[in-house]
Amino acid sequence: MMLQAQDNGAIKELVSRLDLESYKSIIKGLTQFGDRRQGTSRNQKAVDWIEQQLQAFGCSNTKRLAYTYDPEPRPPRRRQSASEPTDLTTPTGGNVGRNGSGPGGSSIFGYRSQTGVNRDLMAQPDERIRELNREEPTNGPRTEVYCTKIGTTRPHEMYILGAHMDGHGVNEAVNDNASGTALVMELARILNSSDVETEISIRFALWNNEETGLNGAYSYVRQRKELQGIENPPGSGEYPEPTWLGMIQHDMMLWDHGAPGPDGKVSRDQRREADINIEFQSNSYFAEASMKLAFRFKAAADAYNTDFPATVGPHMTNTDSTPFMNEVPSISLRENERGA
């Protein structure tokens, strides 16, 4: 089967091969490594496991990108005294908690509540999960894995499908971000089937060190962007880094809880208006092209998705497509919007 643009029959066939049980199985496999926090042996074991799975799916040309994570120590944060008054007003005159500025240039409407990640091992009530995550991270060498479906007619060009495989928080990092990692791996399974060909190359990249500041994705961009479109060895027809046509990130895909209620609590149930949010960054060099890419994904979701509508927003931020957004059209798929 040759997958070409506008070939609705081939697309429908590939969509039908998406398998919920396969997706859940990959997520379950990732949870055996706890939160997969960077700088730990559980993280490195997860990278090894991901590579083995990609090879088993037929994406056998796996590669590792190596880099070093050794940041300067952060200065201690000044803690606000309980007696100091807190300014909760926003530029519109309302109080924080009702309205205010949000990430990626967004505005927040409705109620807000404080969020954060648990770093206290003993705050995790499950003893098994505590033991999985007992090892603390250390700075030093890191690796992340990717593989490539080689295009038949345009092997020198590619789209990058990415997700970060690391997490943190003394948990199993299921939503953030086994959910995105498993989706990219499920796509790798389908698109690397022996009966599937694509005109353009597709790279499946599982980033590391997202939770520490997108370090794995930034390292990829720094190391690989100047290699785009170069045939190596000359005359071989091989392109170790095909020219980037677009970058599509998958980060937190599992459930849409919506905004907190008046009591500041977030519902444990998915909201009735749950959707897929496709984001680009309006303050990026490729904003217009990224917006067009986002709406192409929305059109595809409208045509082939069976459960959830898709919406497009301009506030992409804090995810691994950010390092790419001034190099190539880039979008992020996620469970909920950054803000209005």
What are these regions (language model features)?
Residues 9-13, 22-25, 29, 45-53, ...:
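Extracytoplasmic/secreted proteins, especially bacterial periplasmic and envelope-associated proteins
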Residues 9-18, 31-42, 130-136, 166-178, ...:
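Second-shell loop/turn segments in exported
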Residues 15-22, 27, 31-38, 50, ...:
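Sec/Tat-exported extracytoplasmic proteins
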Residues 23-31, 61-65, 144-148, 158-162, ...:
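Structural recognition of the beta-strand scaffold that forms the well-ordered cores
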Residues 25-148:
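A non-catalytic alpha/beta surface segment that caps or lines the substrate-entry region
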Residues 35-38, 60-61, 68-71, 152-154, ...:
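Solvent-exposed loop/turn segments at secondary-structure junctions
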Residues 145-147, 161-218:
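Alpha-helical metal-binding/catalytic segments enriched in His/Glu/Asp
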Residues 207-320, 330:
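Metal-dependent peptidase/peptidase-like ectodomains
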